[in-house]
Amino acid sequence: MAKIPDKIRTWQMTQPWGKDPQTGKIIEGKLEKKEISVPPLQPGEALVKVAGCGVCHTDLGYFYDGVSTVTKPPLTLGHEISGTVVAGDSRFIGKDVVVPAVMPCNKCPICEAGRNNRCLSQKMPGNSLGIYGGFSDYIPVPAEDLCIVK
């Protein structure tokens, strides 16, 4: 079993590209290599050691095109994630998984009606899952919707 790290190595978007509203001058975007603390896992969460993460047009939109993110920078982009669960929910430890790009709350009336794709409280790594995204070596995520790769 993999050793649980104290820190997550990550590439964080600290400044998206933009334009100064007063001068019109272009503001260059910044990605910075950082180390952030591994948070204490809550019940029902898993820590995934990232094997790979795709670069999606959504990530490019956040960085280059001014598309707003729910969590304001600094944050780690990346939501097309695969990896191995190393801690947390015992059903998944040691399993290779795909982390869904969007995770519903599974508790609201919309989810309970089977329409979790329409959930108003959904979370997305690299946007609305706090500062955590797939462009890192580990990511804490809700375990409930992980997809085991066989």
Show where each model-derived region lies:
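Residues in well-ordered beta-strands of folded domains
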Residues: 11, 61, 98, 140, ...
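A generic structural signal for well-ordered coil/turn residues at beta-strand boundaries
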Residues: 6, 32, 42, 93, ...
